[in-house]
A protein has these predicted regions:
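Active-site catalytic motif of lipid deacylating hydrolases and related acyltransferases
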Residues: 1-67
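Alpha-helical structural signal in soluble globular domains
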Residues: 2, 6, 83-88
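Short, conserved active-site loop motifs that form the nucleotide-linked donor/cofactor pocket
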Residues: 33-35, 69, 175, 207-208
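Residues that line or immediately flank small-molecule/substrate-binding pockets and catalytic motifs
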Residues: 42, 73, 100
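Active-site loop signature of alpha/beta-hydrolase-fold enzymes
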Residues: 43, 79, 104
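Helical cap/lid subdomain of alpha/beta-hydrolase-fold lipid enzymes
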Residues: 51-54, 58, 62-63, 85-234
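Structural motif
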Residues: 68-70, 95
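Gly/Ala-rich beta-loop-alpha elbow adjacent to hydrolase catalytic centers
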Residues: 72-77, 81
Length: 234
């Protein structure tokens, strides 16, 4: 709503389909400034989500071959977005904005795995709350299905795909990292501040503009205002 109010019209949504990803046009599909939402299988491993995102970007490039393409991702979505930049930026993304994303992983993933591996009768505590916020879902069956993405989001250095991603060369585009800032410390109750800061990724050190926002992990209207400001200056 905040993007819409500031002139960024809803261009549509891309959803999984038999053929790959399907674009469902919105009222702003032909507007000069438009945004698109992408529906991804949030419980899937990061590489699988990145595959679907790549298909979505291919669809957008088919419809809009010459327009500037800016990616914005919240939480794990910001990490997924980095995957599609690899290999010489095949979709010609000009800018990446991540919001509260666990670029160096999060200990909450280990807590989620503890819930899965313990096979409890119920899911109290931070493990299930982590899943609700990071990938979505509210019960044990969903948590169990999300084991792959939890392994991917273990703290960097675990030998997982995130560790691999952070060693890959990234294209020379504009990078923004929105880092949550609570009264006690940088970060939030899901992802620590140092993990949200893209400058801590070895191949991106010193190349990222970091913006701090006094907020919890979930998206809020102020994020839309912040995004619109970045987009207007792009």
């Amino acid at each position: 709503n905040e993007l819409q109010a500031r002139g960024w019209h809803r261009g549509g949504v891309l959803v999984p389909a038999v053929q790959g990803m399907q674009l469902i046009p919105g009222p702003g599909a032909d507007a000069v400034h438009k945004s698109f939402a992408v529906s991804l299988p949030a419980e899937a491993p990061l590489a699988v989500q990145a595959h679907y995102l790549a298909l979505a970007l291919g669809v957008l490039r088919h419809h809009y071959p010459e327009e500037k393409l800016i990616l914005a991702g919240h939480s794990a979505g910001g990490v997924v977005a980095r995957f599609v930049l690899l290999g010489n930026n095949p979709y010609q993304v000009s800018q990446l904005i991540t919001i509260a994303s666990p670029h160096l992983g999060t200990g909450r993933a280990a807590q989620g795995l503890d819930v899965v591996d313990a096979k409890p009768f119920f899911c109290p505590g931070p493990g299930i709350e982590f899943l609700k916020h990071l990938v979505g879902g509210a019960d044990y069956d969903y948590l169990e299905d999300s084991r792959g993405v939890l392994v991917d989001l273990l703290p960097a250095g675990s030998g997982n795909v995130l560790s691999w991603l952070n060693q890959q060369p990234h294209p020379a585009i504009a990078y923004y990292a929105v880092v949550r800032n609570t009264p006690l410390a940088a970060g939030d109750n899901i992802v620590p501040g140092f993990s949200q800061d893209l400058n801590n990724v070895p191949t991106l050190q010193g190349k990222v503009t970091v913006l701090y926002t006094p907020s919890g992990h979930v998206l809020n209207p102020q994020d839309g205002v912040l995004l619109a400001g970045i987009l207007d200056n792009s």
